[in-house]
Amino acid sequence: MSQTLSFVLKTHSVRKDFVHSVKRTLQRRRDLQYLYNKLSRPIRAEACPSCASYDVCPNCTSGSIPDDGSSKGQIPSWEDVTKTSTYSLLLSEDTSDELHPDDLVNVAAHIRKALSTQSHPANVDMCKEQLTSLLVMAEAMLPQRSRSTLPLHQKYVAARLEWREKFFSKPLDFLLEKIGTSRDILQITAVWKIIIEKACYCKSYGEHWFEAAKQKLREIKSYEHNTLKPLIGAFIDGLRLMTIDNPNPMGFLPKLIGLIKPLNLAMIIDNHENTLSGWVITLTAIMELYNITECTIDVITSIITGFYDKIGKATKFYSQIKALFTGFRSEDVANSFWYMAAAILCYLITGLIPNNGRLSKIKACLAGATTLVSGIVATQKLAAMFATWNSESIVNELSARTVAISELNNPTTTSDTDSVERLLELAKILHEEIKIHTLNPIMQSYNPILRNLMSTLDGVITSCNKRKAIAKKRPVPVCYILTGPPGCGKTTAALALAKKLSDQEPSVINLDVDHHDTYTGNEVCIVDEFDSSDKVDYANFVIGMVNSAPMVLNCDMLENKGKLFTSKYIIMTSNSETPVKPSSRRAGAFYRRVTIIDVANPLAESHKRARPGTSVPRSCYKKNFSHLSLAKRGAECWCKEYVLDPKGLQHQSIKAPPPTFLNIDSLAQTMKQDFTLKNMAFEAENGHSEHRYGFVCQQGEVETVRRLLNAVRTRLNATFTVCVGSEASSSIGCTAHVLTPDEPFNGKKYVVSRCNEASLSALEGNCVQSALGVCMSTKDLTHLCHFIRGKIVNDSVRLDELPANQHVVTVNSVFDLAWALRRHLTLAGQFQAIRAAYDVLTAPDKVPAMLRHWMDETSFSDEHVVTQFVTPGGIVILESCGGARIWALGHNVIRAGGVTATPTGGCIRFMGLSAQTMPWSEIFRELFSLLGRIWSSIKVSTLVLTALGMYASRFRPKSEAKGKTKSKVGPYRGRGVALTDDEYDEWREHNATRKLDLSVEDFLMLRHRAALGADDADAVKFRSWWNSRSRLADDYEDVTVIGKGGVKHEKIRTNTLRAVDRGYDVSFAEESGPGTKFHKNAIGSVTDVCGEHKGYCVHMGHGVYATVAHVAKGDSFFLGERIFDLKTNGEFCCFRSTKILPSAAPFFPGKPTRDPWGSPVATEWKPKPYTTTSGKIVGCFATTSTETHPGDCGLPYIDDNGRVTGLHTGSGGPKTPSAKLVVPYVHIDMKTKSVTAQKYDVTKPDISYKGLICKQLDEIRIIPKGTRLHVSPAHTEDFEECSHQPASLGSGDPRCPKSLTAIVVDSLKPYCDKVEGPPHDILHRVQKMLIDHLSGFVPVNISSETSMLSAFHKLNHDTSCGPYLGGRKKDHMTNGEPDKPLLDLLSAKWKLATQGIALPHEYTIGLKDELRPVEKVAEGKRRMIWGCDVGVATVCAAAFKGVSDAITANHQYGPVQVGINMDSPSVEALHQRIKSAAKVYAVDYSKWDSTQSPRVSAASIDILRYFSDRSPIVDSAANTLKSPPIAIFNGVAVKVSSGLPSGMPLTSVINSLNHCLYVGCAILQSLEARGVPVTWNLFSTFDMMTYGDDGVYMFPMMFASVSDQIFANLSAYGLKPTRVDKSVGSIEPIDPESVVFLKRTITRTPQGIRGLLDRSSIIRQFYYIKGENSDDWKTPPKSIDPTSRGQQLWNACLYASQHGVEFYNKIYKLAQKAVEYEELHLEPPTYHSALEHYNNQFNGVEARSDQIDSSGMTALHCDVFEV
């Protein structure tokens, strides 16, 4: 393959050599050939794209070659071509000899023919797929600009474009499937190009494209890697285990023979016939032989038929394959069975049916396999061929990906910066993947090709970096111009100044030339005589250089295209005092950017005056440049005397300030300071640099401190770099700066108090602080000395640079590696450690390469750790501290550092899963080696077999303890336990702190489990103790002790190493631990006859209690009274008691999410029988982090809605405390006579009603029809001009014939869909944050209402009574008090609520009678009304009205705006909050009510419950509202799955709290997805205003930067966020001066901040009137209330006055017309009068007289009009 590839690539490159060598001798031949071709070639419609690349085009001459490759005319046959020296040289590596031009053209012509004709003999050795793959590979290896020289390149590009157009609109799954199944390299390349293109534009197509591209670029899937090799490896492992590793191989041999049945198998194969029926018979006989007929008989026919169909559809290209499988004769081969097996194996490995050439090679290998030895050799040859062909497929796949990425690297495809950055990241991923393949020993022969692919990707990476750099700002350079007469020494001074500014040689730019390829980009740039040429626009050139915008230089060389100007200091020289005339348009911009130094040489000038005409002697010039006079002009001085006029009029009107005289040193210092000051704003944003340390000393001590720091670096083998001054140099670690007191520095500073050479002796013992005399913590010292920037892989090793080993680990298993790596990782890096461990398990022989690849993506801890890994693949040394360095060695290198003995390498078997990384030759060699060992073991004597058995028995486990030690008494139990000093201290401190008596083995095992992330209680507590110990590790001080022994320095601890009691978790970073039990008021204790506690029970209501059977068995008492009426169902049981607890808990048959103390629960919730100390119990296994104790049985496990789903019945004890056994809730009928009416009867069967699953009711309540809205008499003719009309009236309405029932059903369907909402842990954390935020202004323990009538009078009496009583509340009241039916209903519900029992959560459904937009009327869209039960509303008002009022009373400060008056100064407070934010987002939501998650609503109700007094009334209200709502209409009852009914009590407050929780969850999830751990209260760092689904979010810049992800998370929760105006598009920040909230535009008017009501809402007040109920809404009402109607129009005029005079005049005309036609006694106010009235009411000067708060009359925001 590599030889043929060299031919393809060398075809063009070699042509340049031989064309020049034979140009003269072949001139006449070329002329004749061109003439002949011109006469003989047929006319073509378009020119051949390859003609320009050849002397004689092979595309055009190939047409005269026959399909069989024979000779016809002047081109020789293929057989003759292969005999030429040119063909031989092409296939060899020696290309020093010249290639004959004619032969080269003939070879190219035949290759062209072979690509177009499958029967050409060249295809015998290579199939068309291979030839095409070679050309694609050549494309990938060449730069994109050189690919046009390849054969068929344009054709392949066109093919890929056609595939792109065909597949571009396909989904991602389809494209990924195509990559795995397609065998067309052009199609695969096109698919990769589509995936990568959409990944680069993932903002438009979705982030999943980018994530999928990153994942798939790292994967190369093949059948042989994933299935075939592991299968064969497992077979070899099993064979070894049963033979070589079997202590009794002789006993196994008969079983092996009986299992394989070799004689029967040989007879079946010998009688095989190569026909379709023969293959069916042979395969069926083999299946019968091994008893697998039944499991495969259904697929045998389809397998054989499918394979032959594929062969039959093959073209003539596969002629030999057809002949092989359809008609092999005896003279060709004795039996084709093995050929068929080899062909199938070749297909599985390479993915292609073997072509003629490959089958010929297979046939040649198998033809001579007549003996055992020759068969083994043939098998090895086949394995080598298969490995080579498989490697070819891998290289082809990498080539396709490289071509796709390289073709996307152009500005027309990846145009914006984001797409370039993503393309850069993908190119780096593929580059690293190819680099990993270069480390694979199987791919060593393909390393030249892989390196070329990496070179192509390097070009892409470089190009992307250039394109990124062009789009970014750069530091503004400093430009100084040295002006003066010729010969004064300006240029020499400029060069000397450049040396003082930088150690680098200066770059030089000459403006007389228009290209700058010689520019090197060094820190200092010199432009000599920049204004010498009048043809150059040097003013604009200088302005472009001294700018923050990138400056692209004009370069001629292709590799320099895109070169940027990057120098920091620019030194120019000029002979002109005024380089740019002040009258120039660019003079201001020019002089603002440059500083001019007037240079004079007084000695030279005096010599010229005294001796004119003589040369200036050398004595007039000094080495220290003291002969020069350097005068620095003031800012914008265009000459020595004047400054530019800012107005650009009189440039000689402003005198220049006196100059500042400098020397060469002070000038260099001034330029450095100017550069620092000019770019200070960019450095200030970076903040304090934590990797820079400054050591401040006096000027005379600088060199001594530098030597001391270098000695420290050498002594500790540190990674930091020592620098003198504040300028830093490149370093792999921190930088230590030696500073003087007056130097500015951005980093940590330490004052050196002891500085002398004698301090070097103090370095012994690592006393660095004492040697330098600095007060520096050990943590900072460790960070300074050992911090590593990034991840570094070292291929070359120097022993003096290796760090001292702290740990040496022999990798005998995966767990050794995982346990050692945990020392290097942060907690966030544990997942990467597990992945690395799995990779090592699957490929242990590639440990160094895998560690090298794994290290690039993991995060390391700040502790300094050095570990040496002894692996079968070599030695790996890993050093980490923030970053990491790794050395991969092929030999043992163990240095001092506590290692007492050199460990021996581990022995990891290379088979099983690791077989996928081994070449086929090694797999078959392992197989034959195993067979040889088995054979030798059988032939040898019994003594050898006995010895083998004795040898195998060595590895059996031995007893470790006898006698007194067998019970593991004593701390050092077991054998082989060795602890380091640090581990010993940890063990002692852990036992002492936690008051435990753990052995060393148990301690190490506990630490191991905790490191791997176990969630049992012991592991969780150990991690907490470890974190606390780590935080206190540095709590010590250096003290001086003066005693009898003299003066000595010691370190004493300021705090003990013990775990810290965190108390209440205010970090919000993790779930809180065990806390208060759920349903505390509903839990009671079950005792025995003596009063001893046995367990717990939970009150279900009405004196019925639930517990577990083993607690209730025997004589059991509850509150001193014997229980009765005990019923059991398995382990779950119920009983009755006359003692009733103050509250009750709801029960539900579902899966729990929390244990009794609030900790998360992990369970599959599948009941199984378990053996316990109380017998066999059927329950569900669960794990929690809470430790339980005997007597906790019966405590409740709850779901997200607070419903009890199971009871605790057992735990795993001290050994496995996290294991819990939970008895699920099952229904037990404990009912007596019902005490309350309930519509929804669970005992009735489910029915389907218009697509809804519901229960049928005994009574039918129809949906009210008609409307009370009528057209005003003033607009009977023009009412259609109004944008709104009354909502659809049902099937008889011509505007929309949709029935009211259909409207209700369509509205209810979204409520029946399940909405998950945010993740459990995220919601729980945000709930804690919101409670903590509200606690600042909402008191706790707010008392609930104890009077039923007082609670009832808090309700709105104009609303429905609900499903149990018809009409409105005020219809059932006499003299302000409820009548008997209403009072009886309230009393029944109140009685249950006082016992804490949840009430039926049922609503009656109606449709809102309101004005709707005309387009929504046509669609039949109406809003539903959920009529809540008056009893439930009364109980909820008693429970939560006080909490709700406390929240709404603080709307000016909190996030909930319920209760705000938008026509009062409150709107000014809102405006103040809005304008103080960095970014403001106004958001509305579609279908808000139906998309609410029940878990979020339950969390909001729990917030209300948190601030209440937790009375039984509160328990009843909370449990009622958290239960699923039931909608009742048309005689059916529907239980909904999600959503929040609009008629739910306190719906506005609950909706607003839901809104806060949703936004908080979205922000938290977005930040932590970006790697930002949220340990603070989010609601304290941003502001928001919510009123139901209306929201305004005031985000800081950190939140605004992830706003797209925040709104994406909200959509993922099931919500539908939209813009306020409902327009299509992403939600963007809005102008804070015009925010829309609650249909009001908060803006500034001449009268101040006002909330302007929508104009259309004001206008439609004049078109419609509320009157009697009717279906004829176009007819005016029979009677009009002049008082309420007049007040309504008066208010409309007041609101209109805030929109200005022009709009008010329009409203004034409508008001006059309404007064005239409606016969009202009203005089509409003038504009100024209306304005005055509104402002007086706004400021509270005038009492309001409108009906805005009266729901029974026509007001601007009542249910009649949509505001």
From Swiss-Prot:
User: List-wise, which residues carry O-(5'-phospho-RNA)-tyrosine?
Assistant: Y984
One Gene Ontology CC term in the entry: membrane
Q: Effect of altering E46A?
A: Complete loss of proteolytic processing between P5.6 and P32; Complete loss of infectious clone recovery
The GO molecular function terms of this record are: ATP binding; ATP hydrolysis activity; cysteine-type endopeptidase activity; RNA binding; RNA helicase activity; RNA-directed RNA polymerase activity
- Keyword Phosphoprotein listed? The answer is yes
Q: Which GO terms describe its biological process?
A: DNA-templated transcription; proteolysis; symbiont-mediated suppression of host gene expression; viral RNA genome replication
Q: Which residues form the SF3 helicase domain?
A: 458-614
State the protein's name.
Genome polyprotein
Its lineage opens with: Viruses, Riboviria, Orthornavirae, Pisuviricota, Pisoniviricetes
